[in-house]
Amino acid sequence: MNVWLNMLTTTGLGAIIGGYTNHLAIKMLFRPHRPIYIGKFRVPFTPGLIPKRRDELAVQLGKMVVDHLLTAEGIGKKLTDENFQREMIQWAQIEVDKLLMNERSLRDVLEKWELAHVEEKAVQEIEEMLMKKVDTFVSKYYTYTWEQALPQFVHEKVEEMIPKAATFILTRGTQFFESDEGKARLQKMIDDFFASRGTLLNIVGMFLGNVSVVDRVQPEVIKFLQQEGTKQLLRDVLQKEWQKFKGREVKELASFIEKEMIVKYIVSTTKTRDIVSGFLNQSVQKICEPVRTNIVETLVPNIVQKGLTWGVNNTAHILKRFRLAEVVQQEVSTFSTERLEELVLSITKNELKMITYLGALLGGTIGLMQGILLLFLM
């Protein structure tokens, strides 16, 4: 009976000692959090291992994350995964489509993105671009004649427009002199003419009787403007002036016309400000509707694909510039010892319990073997 009691006692003591020893060793990893002193003598094994080596732990965790967890190869493999690429493309298409279907005006959207005064900036950019174009043109063709400087299609267009311009001028002239305003202007011109000729008006009045001079002159002026010969005369005049202009040098125009005047004339003539304002007041949906399908179905997948490919090729460089190891090290260094202990225990709680149980099992086994050995010795 005493033999079995001895064996049970040694086994129990061994299990208790083994389990408690491992439990104490685990606790000593974290506790105490600070060194303990008796007088000037520091108690051995204080502070615990992890509090004592926290800075080294932070460095090693940073290296572990970079060398074994977030590696360039691992990230590159993820970026080239077909399922991941498909998900990214679908997500990008949904988000871009939301932007393109926005019913707010482009002006409101840009102002929301803190791009205020976008209209003024757009007009200013256009003016600056035109100024650069004018500068480039004048610098390049300063000693050229306009015939040499202007492209061939401009020559052809002007030649084509001369007959149309002559017809337009004569048509407008005819319409003007047929109107009451034109008749009144013609009357004034006649009155001014005869006023400087003294009695000439009385002599003409004798020949015309009760018919006023303007009533006789107006039909003749209109008839003159409508004659084919007049049209040909005006075409010839315009053609001669065009030929003279082509023979002049570009520098002649640049010497008496400021470039700013040219730019402002172009902006004013083309109503650039009104065009920009009208464009900005349109909804994003209306502006993007003609190209929405092409953007969502073609452009977005291509951009995402190229972006992922670029990411694969530059992952190592990005991680190096990001200095991920330093980020992890700095974050871990800011953890309190209590939080660090809680973090480690939350991850390894079950494993540490098993280590405690294993210590108890080994201690109990050793105690049992001691009991058996004592039995044989007795």
UniProtKB/Swiss-Prot annotation:
Lipoprotein listed as a keyword: no
Membrane topology type: Single-pass membrane protein
Transmembrane segments: 358-378
UniProt-listed InterPro entries: DUF445 (IPR007383), UCP032178 (IPR016991)
Chief location of this protein within or outside the cell: membrane
Assigned GO CC terms: plasma membrane
Keyword check for Nucleotide-binding: no
Localization annotation: Cell membrane
Superkingdom of the organism of origin: Bacteria
Xref: Pfam families: DUF445 (PF04286)
Keyword annotations from UniProtKB, A to Z: Cell membrane, Membrane, Transmembrane, Transmembrane helix
Record family assignment: Belongs to the UPF0754 family.
Protein known as: UPF0754 membrane protein Bcer98_0694
